[in-house]
Amino acid sequence: MFDVTLLILLGLAALGFISHNTTVAVSILVLIIVRVTPLSTFFPWIEKQGLSIGIIILTIGVMAPIASGTLPPSTLIHSFLNWKSLVAIAVGVIVYWLGGRGVTLMGSQLQLVAGLLVGTVLGVALFRGVPVGPLIAAGLVSLIVGKQ
């Protein structure tokens, strides 16, 4: 039996490799392994909890410099005195607000999910983007304050 979904996943993984975006390629290959093994029984759990777990891991990565002491408290305090840091804070708030609206939209209008997923994968693969909110916020900040 021909599995169109598997073919699509393989194509997207290939696109990830061709564009040198291992994040996309490895993620899709993991999903392919789950799909073709008995691990496929975990798909409902992955679909329900995957985004939350990803956000937790991302947040750990973002907060690690504070927890490790690499980013000292004095730097955090001074961030409220620098206009670029204030722009970063404002953009972060706006992006998280938009993210909340996006989660609600994806939950209520499932017909948009496929387009969002394809657009995300293509954007990540073709433009070497990263599918995460905080890094998008940083990208927006770089547009406002200039890339330095």
From Swiss-Prot:
<keyword id="KW-0472">Membrane</keyword>
<feature type="transmembrane region" description="Helical">
    <location>
        <begin position="86"/>
        <end position="106"/>
    </location>
</feature>
<feature type="transmembrane region" description="Helical">
    <location>
        <begin position="51"/>
        <end position="71"/>
    </location>
</feature>
<protein>
    <recommendedName>
        <fullName>UPF0756 membrane protein YeaL</fullName>
    </recommendedName>
</protein>
<keyword id="KW-1003">Cell membrane</keyword>
<dbReference type="Pfam" id="PF04284">
    <property type="entry name" value="DUF441"/>
</dbReference>
<comment type="similarity">
    <text>Belongs to the UPF0756 family.</text>
</comment>
<keyword id="KW-1133">Transmembrane helix</keyword>
<feature type="transmembrane region" description="Helical">
    <location>
        <begin position="121"/>
        <end position="141"/>
    </location>
</feature>
<dbReference type="GO" id="GO:0005886">
    <property type="term" value="C:plasma membrane"/>
</dbReference>
<keyword id="KW-0812">Transmembrane</keyword>
<feature type="transmembrane region" description="Helical">
    <location>
        <begin position="14"/>
        <end position="34"/>
    </location>
</feature>
<dbReference type="InterPro" id="IPR007382">
    <property type="entry name" value="UPF0756_TM"/>
</dbReference>
